[in-house]
Regions:
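Active-site HxH/HxHxD metal-binding segment of metal-dependent hydrolases
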Residues: 21-23, 37, 44-118, 135
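Divalent metal-coordination and catalytic microenvironments
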Residues: 29, 41, 66, 78, ...
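Fold-independent oxyanion-binding glycine-rich loops
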Residues: 42-43, 89-90, 103-104, 140-141, ...
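Conserved beta-strand hairpin/beta-sheet module of binuclear metal-dependent hydrolase folds
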Residues: 8-57, 129-140, 146
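Metallo-beta-lactamase
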Residues: 123-178
Length: 179
């Protein structure tokens, strides 16, 4: 994991929660140095487009953790409005996906690098994005604010194993979930 972003003098990611529906969190992730902004799990395009515009941020990427509509429903509208590239799990049907992600792949936002970790349980193809140097993890619906995500496609054993993986992250990693 090496030297973290702050020690390298690298600008830290600016992460903003954008509430949607009754209990979703859509995440705007901005890199000041490059000017690039990603949206994590945009179930609805309007709130993230509005928030990004107010901040003067240009959305260049969409990162989906799984296929559920409350996490992908805004993909096409964001892509149409911004030209953003959409990345999501290879094993799932992600609307508008340009890049299929599997275990060990990477996503990049400026100089920030996130590794893709497959975390089946909530859905079979569910992924998490872990930015080791930034001490940030986007876990989608693997973890909710008050416990683990519901089991729709995976097994309790898979979910438990992935809870252990998340629990094994360094203590200072900030976890960003979808609900």
């Amino acid at each position: 994991m090496g030297i973290d972003a702050e020690q390298r003098g690298m600008v830290m990611l600016d992460i903003v929660a954008v509430p949607a529906f009754s209990d979703n969190y859509l995440w705007l992730v901005h890199d000041e140095a490059s000017g690039d902004t990603a949206v994590v799990d945009p179930g609805d395009a309007t709130p993230v487009l509005t928030d990004a515009e107010k901040r003067g941020w240009a959305i260049t990427q969409v990162w989906n953790t799984h296929w559920h509509p409350d996490h992908t429903g805004g993909n096409q509208a964001i892509k149409a409005a911004t030209g953003a590239r959409i990345s999501g799990p290879a094993g799932e049907n992600i609307p508008g996906r340009d890049v299929a992600l599997s275990e060990g792949d990477e996503v990049r936002l400026g100089e920030h690098v996130g590794r893709v970790v497959e975390v089946p349980g909530h859905t079979l193809g569910h992924i998490a994005l872990i930015f080791d140097d930034d001490r940030v993890a986007f876990v989608g619906d693997t973890l909710f604010a008050m416990g683990c995500g519901r089991l729709f496609e995976g097994t309790a054993e898979q979910m438990y194993a992935n809870m252990q993986r998340i629990a094994g992250l360094p203590e200072d990693v900030r976890i960003y979930c979808g609900h």
